[in-house]
Amino acid sequence: MRTNFTNRIYYSPLGNGGSKVIPVLRIFDYSKAIEFYIDWLGFKVEWEHHFEENTPVYMEVTKGDISFHLSEHHGDGTPGTHVFIWCNGVEAYHTELINKKYKYNRPGIEETFYGALAFTVNDPFNNKISFNEKLPDKKEGS
């Protein structure tokens, strides 16, 4: 365990359930981000921050254990980022999204060469998010 003596925060070792990665994705338009992440993908806004009125937003959105930080700030994140997520329920989630008939995204779903069922969505800011679920191992001869 590592100790930060400046503020006495204790960190869990990597891989022992105390770690979480949260990608920072660059956005350029708050309304389009809400339409995509909240209205279509079904995430919820955990919090938003502005340094003052009429300044760029920095916010966290979540769906289950998945979190993204979305930032309008110049220099935060790089447009064109690709986030790869292992999760469960990919087929049902894909069906839910397709049934919403979002005009700007109709992702296909596929079995991948690495043994997953997967689909990828593209946000309005050129970021890609791939949702992947491990398929059961195929038995020899089946």
Predicted regions: what they are:
Residues 52-57, 77-79, 112-117:
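Short acidic/glycine-enriched loop/turn segments that link adjacent beta-strands
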Residues 64-68, 75-77, 89-92:
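Short, charged/polar surface micro-motifs in flexible loops or helix N-caps
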Residues 69-71, 120, 130:
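Conserved beta-strand in the GNAT
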